[in-house]
Structures are given as C-alpha cells and as structure tokens.
C-alpha cells in the first residue's frame, strides 16, 4: 500500500498505539478520582501535557486537551470572540481556513460579529499589506492558519501578529497549526500568538485527541460545562488513551524532527522532479509536505479511484469537505477545469521513495 493522504489522517505508530492500549487496559482510572488508579491516569495526562508544552515552547498549564483540531478551533474562535466582544465585534480571518474555522466564523457573523475574509495571492499566501489594511480599532480577533491543509502554503503568521499588535495590542490572535505541527519548527513565543490548535491524528497519534494552547493571562470561557476538567475550560472526563497516544506521538516525532523534515523535503523533491517529466499532469501548488496536482483528462473522483486500483491513496482536498469543490483553490483563482481534476498528495516521514515512484508511474499510465 502506498498511503499519500497524510493531511487527512496518519497511520498510528506502534509506540503510540501501545501507549493508548496500555491506558485502556491497565491504567483505566478516571483521572479525576483520588485513588491510585485515578492518580495514575492523571499522571498520563500530565506527561502528555508536558510533551506538548515542550514541543510548542510553552508552559504545561497553557495546554488544554480537546477531542481534536475542530473542537480546539471552535473553542479558540467562538470563545475568543465572546471574550473580546465588549471591546469590539470585528474579526479577521482568511478565505482558505479549514472548515472548522470558516464555519465558526459564519456562526459568529450570524450572531452580531463582522467578519472580514481575506483572499490569498496566487501562491496561496495572504498579503501582509491586505491584512494590515483590514485591521481596525475594533478588530478583536484574528484567526490565520499556519499551514494550509490543501496546498501546504505557510502563512506569514509571525509578521501578521506583529502588525496586529501595533494597531491592537489587546486583541487575540489564533492560528490553526494542525498541518504544521511536527512538520516544521516553530514555537508559540516566536509566533507571538495567543491561541494555537493542534491535532493528534495528523502526527501518527490516535484520533479523538487535540489540544489548544492558550497564552497565560488569557481567560477563556468554556464551551462545555460540567465537571471542570482541563482547569475548567473543557469539561468531560478526558480521553486518557487518546491523550496517552498523542503524547507518545509527539515524543517520537520531536525526537527525530530534523531528520523527519529533511526526509519530507527529499521526498517532495523526488516527486516534483518526476512530475516535471509528465507533461499531461499539471502542478497547482507545492507546500512543504503537500502537493496539489491535476490530471485534466479526468474528474477528481475518477483519478482517486484509478490510483486506488493501483493501491495508491490520495485525496481530492480537505477530507472534511468531501464531495465539495475546493474553496481554497477557488480563492486562489485556479482555473475551474483544474480544480475539478485536482488531487492532493500529502507526505509523511514514514513515506518512502517507493511510494513516490509508484505514484509517478501510475500518473504516467493514466494521464
């Protein structure tokens, strides 16, 4: 099998799976319980929290576990806006965000907030000049993803934060870092953000776990009310097995981050060089670990099925927008015929040269 859909989800590593299984079978206490099994479960969460904090360059108490990236995004955007609404009701985001952010913004727009959606340039990045011109005195929240989930384009988040602070030092800045986490080096201090979302299943951890970084001093209100878990921000008994696997996946990836980044760079270079020899395949966008291409001869779903018949797995864009035309490529003003024939190839450090070569051979055969 040649799995090249790692921006949708990743195969869980043996080590992360074992950590989750151990938590399910042997350390199954409720982390809120005061007996030894509960204390042991709480210890698993604390260790995972520290792994994430070390990876993001923050304090453990600034990490809050969620059910995934979508919940983390919603918590940041909706509750961030609610926290700031007495200061203003203007929000800035981009038109190429993940649906978790786009739809949270639409919800806020229907509840009295004014949302500015910035369109990207042809390379998929947002103009800093356009961003700066959009910032107003009543702009209380910005959400700009760090790495796009369809094109792999990195947004100038740190620079945007600086421009935002110059005009509105009390506003909140959120970034969805789900696709960037453990694929590029960054930390919350150098980015300067107040809120940052990550997800377990995009880094070879189990599904059902994510995390939100909340800068110390930012007093977020919860979306869920109950037993006051996660310091009151996210009630509900924590999914200890998923969190255990998440923490182990972070530990593994962080331990070999430089080699992993170099491997992805090499695989991407191999793919780009091979695509240059295929004139009937159009290259739409190239990111650090994501390549978007088109085979104009076929619609997207047919390309996916033809590749699947050769045991190669890719996607047609965001797995969370199945069956819909790519709002990201539309915002980039990609030709409609290419959008209808586009597929996304997303790499992991677990991919091999054989995966790339199999894809290139298959594209040559079907193009």
What function would you assign to each model-found segment?
Residues 1-367:
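Pyridoxal 5′-phosphate
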């Amino acid at each position: 099998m040649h799995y090249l859909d790692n921006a949708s989800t990743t195969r869980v590593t043996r080590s992360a799976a074992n950590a989750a299984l151990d938590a399910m079978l042997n350390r199954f206490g409720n982390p809120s319980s005061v007996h030894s099994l509960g204390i042991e479960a709480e210890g698993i969460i604390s260790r995972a929290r520290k792994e994430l904090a070390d990876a993001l360059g923050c304090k453990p108490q600034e990490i809050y576990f969620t059910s995934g990236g979508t919940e983390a995004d919603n918590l940041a955007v909706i509750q961030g806006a609610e926290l700031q609404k007495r200061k203003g009701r203007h929000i800035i985001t981009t038109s190429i965000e993940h649906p978790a952010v786009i739809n949270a913004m639409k919800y806020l727009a229907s509840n009295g907030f004014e949302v500015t959606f910035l369109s990207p340039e042809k390379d998929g990045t947002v103009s800093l000049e356009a961003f700066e011109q959009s910032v107003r005195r009543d702009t209380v929240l910005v959400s700009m993803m760090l790495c796009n989930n369809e094109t792999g384009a990195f947004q100038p988040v740190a620079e945007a934060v600086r421009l935002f602070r110059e005009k509105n030092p009390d506003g909140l800045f959120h970034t969805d870092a789900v696709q960037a986490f453990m694929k590029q080096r960054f930390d919350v201090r150098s980015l300067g953000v107040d809120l940052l979302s990550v997800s377990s299943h995009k880094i070879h951890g189990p599904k059902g776990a994510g995390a939100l970084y909340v800068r110390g001093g930012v007093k977020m209100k919860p979306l869920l009310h109950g037993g006051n878990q996660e310091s009151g921000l996210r009630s509900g008994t924590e999914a200890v097995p998923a969190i255990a696997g998440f923490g182990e996946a972070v530990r593994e990836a962080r331990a070999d981050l430089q080699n992993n980044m170099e491997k992805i760079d090499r695989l991407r270079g191999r793919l780009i060089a091979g695509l240059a020899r295929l004139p009937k395949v159009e290259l739409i966008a190239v990111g650090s670990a994501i390549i978007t291409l088109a085979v104009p001869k076929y619609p997207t779903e047919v390309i996916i099925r033809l590749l699947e018949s050769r045991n190669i797995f890719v996607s047609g864009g965001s797995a969370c927008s199945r069956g819909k035309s790519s709002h990201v490529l539309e915002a980039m003003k990609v030709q409609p015929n290419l959008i209808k024939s586009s597929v996304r190839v997303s790499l992991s450090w677990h991919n091999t040269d054989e995966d790339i070569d199999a894809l290139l051979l298959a594209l040559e055969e079907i193009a």
